[in-house]
């Protein structure tokens, strides 16, 4: 076995160095950082639509509850299990095409319904808004499937968000999901480690 950074991670780090994205994210270049945040604030206030060129093979439908759009990916039959998928994006970027491909593959490989919420993002919204909407979404999933048939998956900042919301379930008398899968979770939001 070979341990180390994947080719994608190495390429992404190179891209960040070349474009100054990491410096902007860390606030080292204040003007670029402010531009980056302003761009995402404006982008996130627009209604989200899945790009037409993303080749999703699963059946898909959308619903809006309490102002949060949620996409549901499913197979042809009745899904007996569900996945709540929280995408990454440093808490300010909308779901990317790579996230969609991952969610689609997850649905097709597991046969589970994959719920993909377009949750409120910074800087226009805070974690309390996202937590409240996601807890309500999870409660609806528990009522439909039962907690023992639900997996919560989060990657990067979505992994940090997933870890955070499951900690709050006890306050709402909600059962824990059967599984919590964190893919490279962003647990240190100070970005100093």
Region roles according to the model:
Residues 1-75:
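A glycine/proline-hinged amphipathic helix-loop "lid/cap" segment
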